[in-house]
Structure formats: C-alpha cells, structure tokens
C-alpha cells in the first residue's frame, strides 16, 4: 500500500502522512475507507472554505531532510540546561531534608514538587540515549549513566529497549518492547475470558498510572527485561546502576534514618515515574494514532502519524523538556530537546500536526483497542457496540 504525502488533518487542522489519519473524515462523511479520491476532494473543499494556507505536500520521509538541519547540539546550551535542572533538584532535595525537622508534610510536599525536576532529568537522559545531547558520544553516555541512577533507569538497557521502540513503533507484528501493550479488536475477541480480563486490568487507569509506574521504575528496571540473554553489557548496566542506588539509599538511611527514604526519595521517584508514564501514554495512545501490519508499515509515516504533539502551557513544556513535541522527535530523534521549538517555529505545518490538547489527552484514557478496519483506537464500549460481545 502506497502512502500519500502530508496533508491536513480534518479534526485538528494539522498535517498527516498518509490515509491512516483520514478516518475521522471518512466516518463523518459516511465514505468507505478505500474511497480516497472522494476524501481528497472533500478535504480540498473544506480547506478552501476555511481559507486555510496551502497544504504541504511533503511526505514524512521528505520531512526528515528538513529536520536534519536541527540536529547539531550546542555544548554550552546542553551544559546550561543540565545545570538548570540539577541545581534546583539538589536544592529542593536539601530543603526537603531540612524540612523534616519542621514538618513531615512540608518535606513530603517539597518532594512531590521535586518530582517534576526529576522528569526533566529523565528527558535529558533520554536525549543522551539518542546521541543528541552532546557532540561527544562518550560524554553523553556517561552523563546518561549518572542520570540513570537518579531516575532508577539503567542507561544502556533503556537506550537499547527505547531504540527498539523507535524502530518498531506502530508495527502490529513487532509489539512487546518499550511500548504500552495494545491489542486489536480481533486479538482481544480471540482471547480466553481470563485473557480478556487480564487485558482489561492492564488497561485500567489505576494499573497504568498508579501501580504501573512504581512497578516499572522501582522493580522492573532492576533487571534487563527484554535483554536478559543479549550479553553482559545490559547486565552490567542494570547491576551497576543497582549498586550505586543501593549505596546511595544506604547512606541516606545511615545519615537520616528512614524518613528521608519514605518521605522524600520515594515520593519524588514515584511522582516522576507517574508523570513519565502518563507522557509516554498520551504520546502514542490517541484515537487517530497509527498501527499497521509489516507489509503496510513504513518507518517515517508510522513515526509521524503514530506520535502526538502534546500541547502544553509554557511552564509544563519547560519541566517536560519539550517531550510533548513527540511527532517531531520520533521522525528525527537526533534533535536535542531545546531545539524542538525551533522546528515548530520554522515549520507551521509541523506546528499544527498531530495536536493533542490536555483535555483530549484525558479522553484517550478511555481508548483500549485498535480497530484495523476503521483504523482508529477505540474503547471497549465502542467495540462492543460495533462488533457485539467483547
């Protein structure tokens, strides 16, 4: 199946990379999925009526050539952003510790606030894993490993599994590592009653956003899951990170007892993990995302169509280090996070593409199954309405 160049998204007035994103307009107009000519004519009519700018005809692959112009990091800027994140993080840690002698609740509140700085630390580690943060690979690998101790994430393990996520995202035949488990309607219906129950439990918001983040970062990250038989490098990364974490926690308890661990360290880590999992979820789990079989899957189209542009107010963009500009990041992961706004500034089509508001992101929690026929993510309720018992 040949995919079309970028065109306007009917619902959010952005751009897309292929027919996958026309589904909302297909359904609204009662057109069959295969009738692309009618949809193209309708899109042109709506565009003219709205007096919008001409549609970009760049394909997703052509956008890669444009984005390559933004890949060079600035060493000064990278060091500055790292310092602007670590210094407040350390200061708030110290303030929370000092507050233990005044009020446990005050220390706990400061620890929760510090969680947003830990999110930013994780995104910097994330950029190091993509080799986008410094010109020196050695420098960014060691910065990433050190930050991984703070984020409870073994750097080399995460770098590899995240690379797999980027390489296979949106491919229905390559699920399982570095993504949120997503079943198709047919796969879900084919499962046993126990299997369906377990999937419903997994997709429950309490499991995904309350229990899951703590399990992932505090427990699962202690072993190189997914890479257990892939060599010593990943075991060294996991065990080395664990050893440094254990030394740090031991010193913390020795110096201050259990309260710093229970009221500062764990709350900061848990709130950061929760925010991180939420961000990852909304970056790929939205109604008009992209999934396809290997024979129809194309890397660049899947990157652009299957990743959202999470529209956040400026303070949240800073704390999350622009990770919400995820459609651009997935299309060209070598761009440092602080240069992503430049991309949107210079390319209005990308600025309007794949937009997901905060309100829309809350609605995405209700979506559970991928419908291969309608090419959209849907809720259990909608699947039941369309296909009977699920």
Residue ranges: model-predicted function:
Residues 277-318, 357:
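Membrane-interfacial segments at transmembrane helix termini in multi-pass membrane proteins
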